[in-house]
Amino acid sequence: MKIIWLGHGSFRIESGEAVLLVDPWLNGNPTLPEDQHDAAVIGATHILLTHTHFDHVVDVLPLARLLKVPVVGQYDLMGYWSEAEEIETVGFNKGGTVTLNGVRVSMVPASHSSTFTTPDGLRSGGSEVGYMIAAEGHVVYLSGDTGIMADMDWMGDYYKPDIGILSAGGHFTMDMQGAAYAAKRYFNFKTVIPCHYRSFPILEQSAQALIDGLPGVEVIEPQVMQAIEV
């Protein structure tokens, strides 16, 4: 399995015949160089969406049309988009699991918000969510934008993820100290990858507090477009 950070909260996850783009943000993403846009999305088979804030959703519909791939996400929004936007979608809900080209993806709760702007005004984007992604003997917990929440207790116990991709930039999500607390209290990660940081001045610029807070855990500070192989 390859995990490739596309900057901010965006990822490309490759496993076998599956190439999953998670919250792909290209245009306006200050951490993803423009000359890397094509390489970031080429060969994608699915787009996973955690919620509909602009820095996660702005490129989802254009990419779905360009790449001719389905968008996978929360049932209510996917139902709306399949009709209003005439794109292929895979809608499911928290607790549910879908298999995408051999990769099992389970939807889990997050604690955030999810709205987007339409010509008619602000619209609910359904529930904000995270994902447990199981492939090649690993379970990856992709938190999406979230704060610390009690649901992490059963999520860690039930899915037993060994890799955590945690939003940890602060202000809108957990900060590095909070992510370290959540990882220690609720999970038994072998590897942690922070995200949703280093993109805006208001967000944390270093993962040092996460590294210091998780002795014995491999904390990987991702570099944009560099594959992490697990």
Swiss-Prot record:
GO terms for molecular function: hydrolase activity. It comes from Ruegeria pomeroyi (strain ATCC 700808 / DSM 15171 / DSS-3). Pfam families: Lactamase_B_2. Signal peptide: none annotated. SUPFAM superfamilies: Metallo-hydrolase/oxidoreductase. Keywords: Hydrolase. This is UPF0173 metal-dependent hydrolase SPO2976. The keyword Metal-binding does not apply. The keyword GTP-binding does not apply. It comes from the Bacteria. Belongs to the UPF0173 family. InterPro entries: Metallo-B-lactamas (IPR001279), RibonucZ/Hydroxyglut_hydro (IPR036866), UPF0173 (IPR022877), UPF0173_UPF0282_UlaG_hydrolase (IPR050114). PANTHER family: UPF0173 METAL-DEPENDENT HYDROLASE MJ1163, UPF0173 METAL-DEPENDENT HYDROLASE MJ1163-RELATED. NCBIfam families: PRK00685.1.
